[in-house]
Amino acid sequence: MPLPEHNLLFGFEPKLTDEQRKYVDSIFDNQLTIVNAKSGTGKTTLAVACAKIVGKPLIYTFSPVEEGSLGFTPGTVEEKESKYIQPLLDALVEIREDPRFAIKSEKNPDIINEGAWITAKSHTFVRGTNIKNSTLIIDESQNLTRGELKKLLTRVHSSTTVIMIGHDKQIDLKDPKKSGFRPYIEHFRDEPYCNVVELNINFRGKLAQHADNLEW
């Protein structure tokens, strides 16, 4: 089923472009949606909005590619990861959710009983778990290697909805050829439970759009 009829998607539904509508409908129609999206296209915000409507616990995961490994930075796991989840925080504000109460926290475990529905972890700490009855958002997927994506995706049960978000023109890995994003797009493209979509309209403005068009 696509986006439920008469659901305004936190006010986004009337303003969705054709590309965004296909993206949103795919999340409700398929177990796996892979989106190759430019900057400023609303990819993470729409994914989080859909996850809220789907109603399953959300696991939001990412690659701390700037550090290479979170283990070498000071602080708790939660403190190390906090600077990487800004797209999630922005998305929650857009759907009028308070991140302090939506995201599970080691510092405040009681909020789980108060409606916290999101676990935010780097792929390093997620990949050893079984991912059941959840929505899994893999953000910045272009910065995960084939091996890292494989370790994540092989943990997913059939009861989980997966949204794999990336931009194949913004790979931050030292060796871009190691990115698993494009190979996994082609690997899953023809599977009946998967849909691959693109988002190309940058809503931040002409400057951001033009900057994103530079290739090397």
Question: How would you describe each model-predicted region?
Answer:
Residues 1-8:
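Charged, amphipathic alpha-helical linker segments immediately N-terminal to NTP-binding catalytic cores
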Residues 12-29:
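N-terminal pre-P-loop "Q-motif" helix
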Residues 114-151:
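Conserved RecA-like ASCE ATPase "motif II neighborhood" in helicase/translocase motors
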Residues 139, 161-167:
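Structural recognition of the conserved hydrophobic beta-strand(s) that form the central parallel beta-sheet
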